[in-house]
Amino acid sequence: MPNIKEVNSISKTLEELVLISGLSGYETNVKNYLSKQLKNKSLKTTSDVLGNLVCTMKGDETLPSVILFAHMDQLGFVVKKIEDNGFIRVEWVGGIPEKALASQDIVIVNNKNELVRGIIGNKSHHASQPDEKYIVTSIKNIYIDAGFKNKKD
């Protein structure tokens, strides 16, 4: 059974890992983090042309081999367009249900690897017409408000 120090170490590592942006197709930051963690444990890592990270650990050759694999990527969005009013239109990468999106906090990673916070815009319930109140907004109509006044911001 693991001791409290090991549990805390695993918890800290897991927290660090899930906070790294790793949208499908853009998992390099996650791969670099994992590679560093594994090298710190004196394990050799390699990467293939598809971006997969491979770590091999020598074991007892008389015992069966074990493989452990997991996704490094996350579901999310890519910026499709920035409107003249500064609102950001996005396109799906993965299968996030539309009904789960309204008013969610969003972190955008720009082309300089800087983080930009935003929120998925949502017409408030009390400002909605009766026929709008319980309709899920389509991804085509979803926008992110990151506080920009215009496209140039």
Per-region residue spans from a language model:
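N-terminal hydrophobic/helix-forming segments and targeting peptides
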Residues: M1-D153
